[in-house]
């Protein structure tokens, strides 16, 4: 919980990126949401951002986080409640990226003839449909860029690609187009290094 505060207070920071999700995390969050419809997001995001929220607003730092898990809107609601307590709600422009949750559409997709086959075994999803806890498409950087372009200073997503959280500000700030492959490749490498935290400082 100290890392965001140290980053925000320790120097000139334009963007703070927080990555919370892994494949197994989505199933855990889905179970939480089934027990309580207001849950299903990374609640430790709210704790991590609490001490730095006034500083983020004061310094103009933008935040991008996939802390929305399987319930980005509830995560946004919790963040707005925190902003109320901190007295900064009027200074926040919050963007919420949705569209990754395909669980409600699985039966529709299979009925349209999509086998959604297991990549290793080739078996169709229908064989294990009753055991599926979550089904998410990976969202790229484009909707995050759209949120930034509309003035959002905090963007919460559901299941985005790990690199999208870094790629979005790079594309937004430097105007990289969708076919500038060398620049996009560099952004993907930067994103992978950053989202794997300790690798930024030589760890593994």
State where each predicted segment sits.
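Short, glycine-/Ser/Thr-/acidic-enriched flexible segments
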Residues: 21-23, 161-162, 200
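Catalytic or ion-translocation cores adjacent to nucleophile or general acid/base/metal-coordination motifs
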Residues: 82-104, 166-204
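Catalytic alpha/beta core domains of metabolic enzymes, predominantly
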Residues: 117-141, 145-149, 155-157, 161-192
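Metallocofactor- and cofactor-centric catalytic cores in central/energy metabolism, strongly enriched
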Residues: 1-116, 124-143, 149, 154
């Amino acid at each position: 919980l100290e890392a965001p505060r140290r980053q925000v207070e320790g120097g000139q920071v334009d963007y703070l990126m927080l990555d919370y999700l892994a494949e197994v995390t989505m199933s855990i969050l889905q179970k939480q949401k089934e027990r309580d419809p207001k849950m299903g997001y990374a609640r430790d995001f709210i704790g991590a951002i609490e001490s730095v929220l006034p500083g983020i607003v004061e310094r103009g730092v933008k935040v991008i986080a996939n802390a929305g898990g399987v319930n980005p809107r509830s995560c946004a609601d919790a963040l707005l409640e925190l902003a109320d307590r901190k007295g900064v709600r009027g200074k926040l422009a919050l963007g919420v990226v949705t569209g990754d949750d395909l669980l409600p559409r699985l039966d529709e997709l299979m009925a349209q003839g999509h086998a959604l086959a297991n990549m290793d075994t080739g078996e169709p999803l229908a064989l294990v449909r009753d055991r599926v806890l979550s089904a998410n498409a990976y969202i790229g950087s484009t909707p995050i860029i759209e949120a930034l372009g509309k003035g959002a200073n905090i963007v919460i997503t559901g299941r985005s690609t790990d690199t999208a959280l870094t790629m979005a500000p790079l594309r937004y700030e430097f105007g990289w187009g969708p076919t500038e492959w060398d620049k996009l490749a560099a952004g993907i490498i930067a994103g992978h290094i950053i989202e794997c935290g300790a690798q930024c400082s030589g760890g593994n």
